[in-house]
Amino acid sequence: MDFYHVKDVPHGEVRSRWYTSKVTGQTRHIMVYTPPGYDADREKRYPVLYLQHGGGEDETGWVRQGRMNFILDNLIAEKKAVPMIVVMEKGYAARAGAAPQPQPGGPGRGDGGAFEDVVLKDLIPMIDSAYRTRPDRDNRAIAGLSMGAGQALRIGLTHLDTFSVVGAFSGGAGKANPKTAFGGVFADPVGFDKKVSLLYLHSGTVGLDAGIHKGAKALYEMLQQAGVKNVAFRDLEGQGHEWQTWRYALNDFAPRLFQEKK
């Protein structure tokens, strides 16, 4: 239960950064976690996890409430997870000159895909130029919680030339049809498994997560029946739509990332 506590281990650094978005025409703020030793070895490059918050939150949520930096520090110190960069962006966007959104929305839910374009056209190129990343799909993952889970699924699964791992915590699965969902990405199970090293679904079991759990489990079972192998489903019994659930999700998800294929 202490996996998200501050321990006597090497610590990474959480960096606050501003950058200019061509999509929105505005300056945007992000949080970037760099792992222990990032500044010591100027030659080493790292894989990147793009990690999204939920509705009503912002790019600081995963650090201030999720304690993601301490979770990663501890996993890396225990050699359970590989050192990685984690990027946290604000999940709302409007195109330059567009009217403000009446309600916050993820990709395909009112912003006309603006946030999706921010990630693909602005954020990733900036991160790859500003940090020592491994700039290829095999070393790039996207995940999120609640609203961010839906964003991760849509952006990740419809851009498999960019991402090889997709994670959804407490959201996004719904009643997806394996043959048509996300542009039909699941229609060819063998092809999907060649491109995606992991599709990870996680949920609590009570409160708001009770319905989400049902949908995520159903999608997982349908994908397994369809022949998709690189999909995992985990739940946290007795926990709901809350940060404790998502801390556990990240703690289980991160060790699965960027491992060498056996």
Which residues does each predicted region cover?
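Non-catalytic cap/lid and distal C-terminal segments of serine-dependent acyl enzymes
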Residues: 1-262
